[in-house]
Amino acid sequence: MAILRANLSPKNKLNATLKGWLPILQSELEDLEEVLKQNALDNPLIKIENKRIKNFSDRFSAKKSSDHLENFATASKSLFETLEAQIIPPLFPTETSQKIAMDIISGLNNEGYFEENIEERARILGVESEVYEKVRKRFSYLNPAGIGAKDVKESFLFQLESRELDDNELYEETRKIILNLEKHHEFSKDFYYEKALKILKSFKNPPAIEFLEKEIEVIPELFIVEVDNGIIVRLNDESYPTISLEENRFKDSGYLKEKLKEAKDLIDALNLRKATIYKIGLMLLEYQYDFFKGKELRPLKLLDLANEFNHSVSTISRAISNKYLACERGVFPIKHFFSIALDNSETSNAVIKDYLLELIKNEDKKEPLSDAKILELIEEKFHLKMVRRTITKYRQLLNIASSSERKRLYLMRA
């Protein structure tokens, strides 16, 4: 890492700039233009333009990377990530309610329905089933609407509640039809029947359908590119907004000098953001070189990165949050390349995922392993402590169905 350290800006300048412009470093690439404009609102010298290119492959001379780069431009934000961001006060005000909510998320199937046994899940968490169910009902306030329901009827009821209809009679008619979906034609002569039916047809079925059908575009900050003589890091500079100065419009004055300094500080902050992200890419390439060649991730902690930049782990964590890296293996959140801190263990999350895959591959097809059992086996093998929702998250990232879903699939194949 000596080369990386030698290229870092002087510590004092780095600290001063980051303290003043930390939001620029932490912002997502998609939001960077707006963040810069907010900083430049009162400065007539600054002009900000977005030069984002439409085709990422235009920037690469390496033929191999150009062929695949189109596939790097988008990545899917999972249902898990979308819901996890909503598990906050005031809807989930306590640690217990948040713990239950995360457990519920981990028990959702790909369509967004909760099919797990509430009594069993509550027992594992050490809470009353009534408390667990109360938290689950709060999912009616989350997006996507209908998520966390047990079945279609309850999902429709959740979505109905989220509509907040002013017409109470229309609400009651719609609710009645939902509760009697199998025989809704019996109400066809009701005054509000057609209006209620129109509302029902607008509901999402299944509730997570948007996550099954489409991907949300993300713009990678970094590209790890294979070239003839090795692998290199390239910053996605073409997606950055540009800052230009229009100082010729004003005569020399104290006001101009002050605004000119502010403008140059903003440019320095943007350049520092680029340099910081690029150096993160250099470090990842150095530490995770084997991964980019098709092998497994090495254990790497955020603390290692924080030490390189002389900043706290929390600052670095915020700096890489919601930022992506594209390589031949796909598009990944930058945080993907760091091990999860597990009681100071050096065990990489990639190693745990591999073992999880092995367990699923060799499980009893009649009695598939629950996440709780997988947790028990992993803790025993690696001599560490984890929480079950971490296992569930790993399973979902690996596109492995829940134990109940796997059991149904095994029966279908038998």
From Swiss-Prot:
Q: Which residues cross the membrane?
A: none
Q: Which PROSITE patterns match?
A: SIGMA54_1 (PS00717), SIGMA54_2 (PS00718), SIGMA54_3 (PS50044)
Query: Record keywords: Transcription regulation included?
Result: yes
Q: Molecular function terms in GO for this entry?
A: DNA-binding transcription activator activity; nucleotidyltransferase activity; sigma factor activity; transcription cis-regulatory region binding
Under the cellular component aspect of Gene Ontology, which terms does the record hold?
A: DNA-directed RNA polymerase complex; protein-DNA complex
Tell me which UniProt keywords the record has, alphabetically.
Answer: DNA-binding, DNA-directed RNA polymerase, Nucleotidyltransferase, Sigma factor, Transcription, Transcription regulation, Transferase
- Pinpoint motif RPON box by residue range: 387-395
InterPro entries, per this entry? RNA_pol_sigma_54, RNA_pol_sigma_54_core-bd, RNA_pol_sigma_54_DNA-bd, RpoN_core-bd_sf
Kindly state a single biological-process term from the GO annotations of this entry.
Answer: DNA-templated transcription initiation
What the entry lists under Pfam families is as follows: Sigma54_AID (PF00309), Sigma54_CBD (PF04963), Sigma54_DBD (PF04552)
Tell me which domain of life the UniProt entry assigns to the organism this sequence originates from. Answer: Bacteria
Q: Which residues bind DNA?
A: 301-320
Instruction: Provide the function of this protein.
Output: Sigma factors are initiation factors that promote the attachment of RNA polymerase to specific initiation sites and are then released.
Q: Which family does it belong to?
A: Belongs to the sigma-54 factor family.
Q: What is this protein called?
A: RNA polymerase sigma-54 factor
